[in-house]
């Protein structure tokens, strides 16, 4: 689905901006890529709004927390483990996702 008149597509499971995955679900992990551009950050914020508008409030709150943590920590990725209910800001998500 096109995201609010911009060059990004999304579903509840992913967000793609200019052919770059910014958010996706890998098994029981949510992964957010804080790509270093204002446009990508704007697309993440629009994605959070889209989730709220589509009655995915709990999901939107998780992504919002991931976004805030990523901006604060200045790391490239934020990973959320659904099973452990744990957030981690990392430079390379592959070390966290097992």
Language model regions located:
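Terminal leader/tail segments of proteins
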Residues: 1-98
């Amino acid at each position: 689905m096109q995201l609010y008149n911009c060059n990004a597509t999304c579903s509840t499971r992913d967000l793609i901006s200019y052919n770059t995955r910014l958010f996706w679900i890998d098994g029981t992990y949510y992964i957010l890529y804080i790509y270093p551009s204002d446009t990508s950050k704007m697309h993440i914020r629009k994605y959070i709004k889209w989730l709220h508008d589509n009655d995915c409030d709990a999901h939107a709150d998780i992504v919002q927390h991931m976004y805030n943590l990523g901006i604060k920590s200045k790391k490239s990725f934020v990973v959320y483990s659904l099973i452990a209910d744990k957030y981690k800001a990392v430079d390379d998500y592959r070390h966290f996702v097992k």
